[in-house]
Amino acid sequence: MIESFNQFGSSLLGGFWPVVWNLIKIVALIAPLMGCVAYLTLWERKAIGWTQIRPGPNRVGPWGLLTPIADAVKLIFKEIILPTAANKGLFLLGPVMTIMPALAAWVVVPFGPEVALANINAGLLFLMAITSMEVYGVIIAGWASNSKYAFLGALRASAQMVSYEIAMGFALVVVLMVSGTLNMTEIVLGQDRGRFADMGLNFLSWNWLPLFPIFIVYFISGLAETNRHPFDVVEGESEIVAGHMIEYSGMAFAMFFLAEYANMILISALAVTMFLGGWLPPIDSVVFNWIPGWIWLGLKTFVVVTMFLWVRSTFPRFRYDQIMRLGWKIFIPITLIWLVVVGLWIQSPWNIWK
């Protein structure tokens, strides 16, 4: 069907069709993503409410389902106030620089064997490079606001994000070693072979089982990378009010939160792709194979995102020195040790990734 539509568009628009086709694919990717981001805010409030034995939002629309729309309307019509002493150009650039990497990184995420906006050979490298740019938006926002609270929040954010990017990067390098490729589609397909996969137990052949400590390091680093609880000292309300976002209002303020929730979904989707078999069904059966791969990817991503929310409703906030100690003295040494262990494992007769 997609190929027929592509051929029809090519015959209709000729040389302009590739540009139009890419724009259609971008809109088809970004529009559902923004819808997921909006309703993730509702799911977070509902999940935390149930954890605390209360109903959560239930006033706007049936069962509170229109709450994200009400929030969006409220923020759209709020004024964006520019502080007098702020650098106005950089002040407005900060939110854009924060949300753009969270959206651009999705172009290499595979939703199926041949379903990706850009199935490039260096997909994992591209994703790691593009997501590392988000820290610049936070630094620009903190610097341009000309506020001591915003500047302190930006300093905290940059140090925390850079620290945990190292641990997360090493964790992904371990997956790269066992997969032998940077192509994210091939990384998923590589998890569909082995003794357990031959038995139909696909979920036991995924990377989470042999690389379980690395999976845990990746998940916790993802919490810190997205400034989620218990690593949310960047916007610690009791210390620096709202951190680098303190001077923002309206849609400029909303873009920071859109970026945070989009990054949560991206980190979760990357965890699913690297460790949980991507679009592959957990069991090789007629019923499970009938379900489209993008639904499996979405369900697994939903479970991982819910783990983010569960952590928020369970653990207290860490002190900043505890966060730095965890990243530099525990996670980075663990990932370095596992790099050596996996390297020796691959060269041994017990290599399970052949």
From Swiss-Prot:
GO terms for molecular function: NADH dehydrogenase activity; oxidoreductase activity, acting on NAD(P)H, quinone or similar compound as acceptor; quinone binding. Its EC number is 7.1.1.-. The keyword RNA-binding does not apply. It comes from the Bacteria. Keywords: Cell inner membrane, Cell membrane, Membrane, NAD, Quinone, Translocase, Transmembrane, Transmembrane helix, Ubiquinone. The chain crosses the membrane at residues 12-32, 62-82, 89-109, 124-144, 162-182, 203-223, 239-259, 263-283, 291-311, 326-346. Its main location: membrane. This is NADH-quinone oxidoreductase subunit H. It comes from Methylibium petroleiphilum (strain ATCC BAA-1232 / LMG 22953 / PM1).
